[in-house]
Amino acid sequence: LVAFHSAQMLSQKVIVVGSSGELRSSILNAKPGVKILLKPGEYEGGLFFQNVKGEPNNPIVISASDPTKPPVIKGGGECLHFSEVAYLEIHNLVLVDARYNGLNIDDGGSFDTPSHHIVLKNLQVRDIGPTGNCDGIKLSGVMNFRVENCTIERWGDGGQGIDMVGCHDGIISNCTLRFEDDKGFGIQAKGGSSNIRIVRCRLEHAGSRAIQLGGSTGLQFFRPPLKAGQEHAEARNLTVEGCTIIGSTGAIAFVGVDGAIVRFNTTYRPKRWAIRILQETREEGFVPCRNGVFTDNLIVFRSDEWAEGGVNIGPFTAPQTFTFARNWWFCLDKPEQSRPNLPVPEKDGVYGIDPRLRDPEKGDLSVLPESPARKVGAHAFVEAKRDK
């Protein structure tokens, strides 16, 4: 409490901290509506907190006192770990050099008390791991969440930039992930996750699977817990739209998911596949990977970076239930080889016509004004009225 009282209190609801001790005490004593502002500088990681709970319209906010000079939380097993929290917002921090995870938010292993109403905004997370299943942002048993304008770079070679296990009703928007083409995955939602949108994100060489819809989860980690006699899936009702994916062994992986929509995205030079359809969880009761919808996407590739016609289909899947429509496929070096090997016929697909990208070598994958592909890809995505 001494450190807590030594923190500069501007009012009942704003606390400015400048040391790791002040930060820890302020969070431990946080009440609904408090805003904890970190001065510029470096803070020691390895911070764990439980039951930090704001209230509706009265969240607890942890942020930078000066967003132009974001404080750095460095090191520890995890820079920050929160369990069983609610109405919590974390903004404008830099999280670096943790051994296992940059930011971990979970339900404390008690599946009937999920963390909920979480906002993560303007975070920079980098250099996590570097070996093993280590994540930039790890969410387990989290509901009603937003991850906005975050940048995640270099996570564990067996981990994810953003990993969601048993998470529901969330949106990941305007985030940027950067790594290498063949290390870990980018964004993943598995373990029973549902009703999650991934919107306007940019993934640059973000692992061997840039976006994984579903995955492979130990049965004991599903949230809600699996019940006998019901149909099971790694994930349901996931949507990816307006995203740009550069590189990666596989751009989009449907893995044991029952219902996912991928639309108005731009994929540029995947190293083997634009799409993977896989089933890795094969225990009794699990439905085959099915009901994927892939429409209005722009896929630009090279023939020497293209395997199996750009689509990899594994056993125990139901590729015949997928829908493909209005996608624009272009092979840079051999336009006549632009047609992909899809499991079912595509409706109104376009093959072999140059989309006229603006400046792909410099990372600008928008299209020129005269482009014939103006109506597909990430540049063509417009938020539906329901989201405004």
Regions found by a protein language model. Give the residues of each.
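Bacterial N-terminal signal peptides
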Residues: 1-3
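Acidic Gly/Asp/Thr-rich repetitive segments characteristic of extracellular carbohydrate-active
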Residues: 12-49, 371-375
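Right-handed parallel beta-helix/beta-spiral solenoid domain characteristic of secreted/periplasmic
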Residues: 14-18, 37-40, 45-46, 53-102, ...
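Short, polar loop/linker segments at the starts of domains and inter-domain junctions
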Residues: 25-29, 74-81, 364-376
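Glycine-rich beta-solenoid repeat tracts in large extracellular/virion proteins
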Residues: 28, 46-51, 77-84, 101-113, ...
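Right-handed parallel beta-helix
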Residues: 40, 59, 66-68, 86-97, ...
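Acidic, glycine- and Ser/Thr-rich low-complexity intrinsically disordered tracts
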Residues: 287-291, 295, 301-388
